[in-house]
Amino acid sequence: MGGIKLFHASDLHFNAGYFEYILTLQDKFDIFCFSGDFLYKENAQEKEQVTLWLKSFKKPVFVCSGNHDMPPSWLNSIRGIYADDAIKTINGVKFGCVPYLCDDLLDFAECDILLTHVPPAKTNTSISKNDKDHGDIELARLIKNNLLKAKIILCGHIHEPKSHTDVLNGVKIYNSASNGSKEPFYQVIEL
């Protein structure tokens, strides 16, 4: 991995200001990654506007569905982006887009970077500031047992985690969930 600059955000919840702000950053990044929860309410207007926004990127876009994006078939119907269940290699880096409530995480065992809505359990990225763990137990188990080759997990879901980054068994975890502030929270990952 080398020379790629990733943008990562999650939990934008149909905030038009966030969408506009992120579009102004297009020239600063090579790849854009979003870990779900594009919608605030599940309705046709929100889906249509998010679709147009995602199609407007001139760089590769990887997305996975979140709990607010259900059912996620609308994301998979967007041409020109990599959505749920996609596995794509760019410059030698294999990306995997894990659907919300994924049936088999081992389908993504060979990926270097996983986009998943929910962070691995028992990490500072999955534990909220009120000490509740909302993480994915199976994802954590697979990482701990070296059953996934991922070096990076891009996630969200927890809007105010104890930390936006953590490491589990050598795997770097980035929780980039926005929390409703004026500008979207995002992280820059250099590969």
Predicted regions mapped to residue ranges:
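Glycine-rich phosphate-binding loop signature in dinucleotide/nucleotide-binding domains
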Residues: 25-28, 107-109, 147-148
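Cap/insert and terminal regions of metallo-dependent hydrolase folds
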Residues: 39, 50, 123-161
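A structural preference for long, well-packed, hydrophobic secondary-structure segments
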Residues: 3-5, 13-21, 130-134, 146
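Binuclear metal-dependent phosphoesterase catalytic core
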Residues: 2-3, 88-92, 107, 140-146, ...
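Active-site neighborhood of phospho(di)ester-bond hydrolases with catalytic His/Asp-centered motifs
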Residues: 7-11, 32-37, 61-67, 82-84, ...
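Short amphipathic alpha-helical segments and helix-helix/interface helices
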Residues: 19-23, 47-55, 105-106, 136-145, ...
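Core catalytic region of metal-dependent phosphoesterases/phosphodiesterases
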Residues: 9-90
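Conserved catalytic scaffold of divalent metal-dependent phosphoesterases
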Residues: 62, 67-142
